[in-house]
């Protein structure tokens, strides 16, 4: 039995080597076509080979060929062909029911970073990639993919969309560093506290206490316009500091007094009290209001934050009116 198993393993290794060799030979021919400028013919050949490999259940070969082809087309400025092959990479992942792995997420983030930021293909790609990365366990997408997308968007200085993806990652430190840059580059000095306050409140609405604490600590330590604290000069920052302590304690009386005492600061943004209603329910046992199914603006904001549908998520990441946009 052991000998038979060893022989089978060796045969499998030989077949795998032959398959890789075959893919490499085909890839060489396709690369030569692209180098010559025969973009259309090369694109059609990539598609033909993709469906041939998929029909033979050679999902990994199909995926690797489409990924390398997409990178090749991107390097030659062929955005449409590259985006099409990128979507085929996703199709191979979906149909093969491949488990989520860091390398795959990094590959998806790589092609995302090369896509034209204003192209509709990018919107479709990120929505579909996040849906696949959720693995059927949720609607928000894998935190690592969100982090990689956030980093790319940050480099593009697309701070609003970057913040959305940071909120759904576990990278509180990265989020804070991005917010420091966003605040100093685009914000008013009088609003330095509001940038981090909204991020903390939204992390708490997503039940992510750890990232809420990290983003607050990192932001207040690194922002050049915030003096050392706590306590802080800005009352709103003191409120957030006390709130994070109260969340750990879970005492409703403390939460209630805190919200009452800091109402002048909380009135600076009408959404603060709405977020705090939700935080009260999540961490302090506050019963939902009679109109528990939030309507109007808040309903849209919270459903988007909590990922009520994949479609909404894809749209949210491209919409400047998203719930995570700071005033």
Curated annotation (Swiss-Prot):
One example GO MF annotation: protein-folding chaperone binding
InterPro entries, sorted: GET4, TPR-like_helical_dom_sf
Any one of the GO BP annotations: protein insertion into ER membrane
Keyword Ubl conjugation: yes
Coiled coil: none
Subcellular location: Cytoplasm, Cytosol
Processing after translation: Ubiquitinated by RNF12, leading to proteasomal degradation. When unassembled from BAG6; ubiquitinylation is modulated by BAG6 quality control role and effectuated by RNF126.
Residues where N-acetylalanine is found: 2
A UniProt-annotated Pfam family: GET4
Region (Disordered): 307-327
Domain of life of the native organism: Eukaryota
Bias type Acidic residues, positions: 310-319
Principal location class: cytoplasm
Region annotation Interacts with BAG6: where it falls in the sequence: 195-271
Entry keyword set: Acetylation, Cytoplasm, Transport, Ubl conjugation
GO terms under cellular component: BAT3 complex; chromosome; cytosol; nucleolus; nucleoplasm
Protein family according to the UniProt entry: Belongs to the GET4 family.
General function of this protein: As part of a cytosolic protein quality control complex, the BAG6/BAT3 complex, maintains misfolded and hydrophobic patches-containing proteins in a soluble state and participates in their proper delivery to the endoplasmic reticulum or alternatively can promote their sorting to the proteasome where they undergo degradation. The BAG6/BAT3 complex is involved in the post-translational delivery of tail-anchored/type II transmembrane proteins to the endoplasmic reticulum membrane.
Subunit structure: Component of the BAG6/BAT3 complex, at least composed of BAG6, UBL4A and GET4/TRC35. Interacts with BAG6; the interaction is direct and localizes BAG6 to the cytosol. Interacts with GET3.
Protein name per Swiss-Prot or TrEMBL: Golgi to ER traffic protein 4 homolog
Organism per entry: Mus musculus (Mouse)
Upper classification of the organism: Eukaryota, Metazoa, Chordata, Craniata, Vertebrata
Gene name per UniProt: Get4
